[in-house]
Amino acid sequence: DHIYIDMAWRKQYVGVFELEYNGCKFYFIDNEFYFNGDKPYDFIHLDCEKFIFFSKAVLSILPTIDFRPDVINCNDWQTGPIPVFLDTFQDNPFYQGIKTVMTIHNLKFQGRWDFNKIKDAMGISDYYFTSDKLEFYKDANLLKGGMVYANKVSTVSSTYANEITTEEYGEGLHNLLRARQN
């Protein structure tokens, strides 16, 4: 199966491969432009766009493969755009009710990039690019966006969860993390 999605000024191919192993289905997103190579982090300036593409592709392919998850667990900045995109997809009944969890493994890496580059790559409304959403000290922050829009925020341990709510370890996001504590 495949579809095409809008990425900035062009359409990008989204292929999906399915593998069933021990009764569990795995899906793999395919795209030669973004994923042709032997390293997941290849070209630093393309990484943000690559993971924005991946996040949008994950959600966009779901109706095609007829898979509607109850919860999507997003890990670090690389999948931070998923909860943001999911919010933009809410006019489509297929996506209504899907929940997200944003899991933080290392707060040091936030997917912080040039504001205009992210805005262009994501192709979403200005509404999402304010200081209470994706904007972060005049840049755009993909992890912050995921944290704002996810239904829940989790970390790798309760100790880490407490540490990152402090100014010392919160990497500038401690107030948001305090507000999202459950």
Residue locations for each model-derived region?
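Catalytic cores of nucleotide-sugar-dependent glycosyltransferases that transfer UDP/GDP/TDP-activated
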Residues: 1-182
